[in-house]
Curated annotation (Swiss-Prot):
Protein function: Necessary for efficient RNA polymerase transcription elongation past template-encoded arresting sites. The arresting sites in DNA have the property of trapping a certain fraction of elongating RNA polymerases that pass through, resulting in locked ternary complexes. Cleavage of the nascent transcript by cleavage factors such as GreA or GreB allows the resumption of elongation from the new 3'terminus. GreA releases sequences of 2 to 3 nucleotides.
GO MF, one annotated term: DNA binding
SUPFAM superfamilies for this protein: FKBP-like, GreA transcript cleavage protein, N-terminal domain
Entry keywords, A to Z: DNA-binding, Transcription, Transcription regulation
Coiled coil: none
Full protein name: Transcription elongation factor GreA
Gene behind the chain: greA
Pfam families: GreA_GreB, GreA_GreB_N
Superkingdom per UniProt: Bacteria
GO biological process: DNA-templated transcription elongation; regulation of DNA-templated transcription elongation
Organism, as annotated: Rhizobium rhizogenes (strain K84 / ATCC BAA-868)
Family: Belongs to the GreA/GreB family.
Amino acid sequence: MVEKVPMTQNGFVKLQEELRWRQQEERPRIIEAISEARAHGDLSENAEYHAAKEAQSHNEGRIGELEDLTARAEVIDLTKMSGSKIKFGAKVKLIDEDTEEEKSYQIVGDQEADVKAGRISISSPIARALIGKEVGDSIEVNAPGGAKAYEILSISWG
């Protein structure tokens, strides 16, 4: 059975845009670079040719990965999400119980995660600790710098 990959509509659109760019713009550009480098003669010591072939390999690998991800995508409609328990798509405001620092995160798919932008992967330790919890609950997360305790201040959707 094919394992579905949960993601938001935004995340799915970004993957589709990258796939289109790699197939329709980057692939032809690389093919042209290979053709130009090939015209320079001896391929055994042609750095431009080898660089272009390496770029082609990387691009084709990423195209395969993107095709797989978009085929297995399970797009979650965040506008239909609600409830008092944290699940995929939730926007959560936490307070560090030691430093009193507030943090806000949205739980998203692995491909969409960007901690600096406040989006954490559903498979991250903090998201796994948050799933199923409610406002007022406390969680403990084992972080690289040691265990951190947070209290959940709010949950929102969309």
